[in-house]
Amino acid sequence: EPEIFYIGIGNFAERTGMLPLIYDWRAPVSGLFYDYDKGPGSYEAPAGLIEGEIAAKWQYKVKNGKMVYAFESDTKIDDDILKQELGTNSDVQLKNIVRTIQKEQNAIIRNTHDRILAIQGAAGSGKTSVALHRIAYLLYHDREHLKSSNVLILSPNSVFSDYISHILPELGEENIQEMSFDLFAYRELKGIVPDCEDRYDQLERTMKLQDPYLTERFEEKQLEGFVGMMEGFLARLEDELMDFRAIEYKGIQKTEEELINLFYFKFQNAPLLSRMDAIRDYCVDEYETLLGRDLSEEELLIVQEKFDKMYVTKDIYKIYGWLLEECGYPSLPDVEYEKRKLEYEDVFPVLYLKYRLTGKAVHNHIKHLVIDEMQDYSYLQYVILNQIFKCRMTILGDKAQTLDEQMRDVLQFLPGIFDQKIRKIVMNKSYRNTMEIARYEDAVLDEILSKAKLGEDEYETAAIITMTEAEASTLYQILKARGEEVHYINRNSSIFKKGLTVTTFYLAKGLEFDQVFGV
């Protein structure tokens, strides 16, 4: 008599400690459903390898207490079920794919061996869903060491964060932290500058001015060559930034020569702007040992001031200005802190300098990082991410959907940054569209547009996509004046709603709509 296993969103048992009546889709035995057809099968259980024969596979869907479908499936996920699930209208939130996980997707979700997974996925291949289900799987299997608070997803914007926010709770896990890398950078730069231009401002400015030099300058500052220029500058800065002088305060006495030896030899590996702090602590410890007591806070402040005066400046904003001048770029305005604002092209170079000069980078509480839209991150940004997060990563995107005009393939340079510790996976199968469908749509596009009605009742979501924010705002106002029920997504939006939406191409990244009209 074959043993029957039921698989669902989560475990269900009559009482705690009893065998489940329904097994969680992430349980080891559940992998049989996704990985095998009828016939021989095996799975790795805590007790070892379990082998057997799959006699039959059935699929059920129950909604509101009623059976939607029930039939035997000879394949992993029956095509009729897949078509039914994919054929439903786009919801205002991403759907979980537990019922339709494919074998190649399941291999990614259950991968626990590779430290860094880089997934190149075509539009509609399900890469974002797969990444989120992978996080749910890892949280389930490593509960002792991995909590939701240890996971961070870097997403394109707040609307996208809202779009995916329900997936993990729906799969039985607490939500994880989500933010854009830009927002992360702005928070890290507080104390250096109070304000930064964002990526959207930079895009709008570039499109408005149509100045190729601005685009070229922005791109240059994000490339490997500029990282090399910054490293060369930092090597020379050791000599240019320091003004050594003898220290004498109470029993603390160090000659200029002694301080130079400590700086260049004993503490040579300490970050430049933290090095004198290390030397100060060394001298204070030495003196306190001889004195037999600790210095008071007031005395320590006096000593600190004497050591700090050996820096020409500790202001990273000014130091970056020197770098720009040395590299032949326009320098930063020489203004007081409150009036400083970085252009977007300078945000990540300054962040890189901060980490290299202070050493305050690693966020050890993050044990798994998810990077979505990987194609929109620069070489410099990945170098910084490698400095900050010494953890497992799931990196995903599609090089065909990049905002970068040069269409650089990030998978070419990622292994060099992460020391080859990367498993590359390609997901070519799209569940949204095909070349044949796209060609047919192009052929009948005029006829479709002449008959189409914006936001027809049978569609849950529709979008009008513009190039610039000004165009989107104007169009939104026109439609509102006509009495249309319409939503507007701008950079400050945080919720994705049903109905007709007007937005820009760069804010629509990652979202799905039933109807899309480009203006």
Tell me what each language-model feature is:
Residues 99-111:
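Pre-Walker A adenine-sensing motif
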Residues 139-369, 375-384, 392:
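Alpha-helical nucleic-acid-binding subdomain
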Residues 124:
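Walker A (P-loop) phosphate-binding loop of P-loop NTPases
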Residues 144-145, 149, 158-174, 179-186, ...:
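Conserved helicase motor core of SF1/SF2 NTP-dependent helicases
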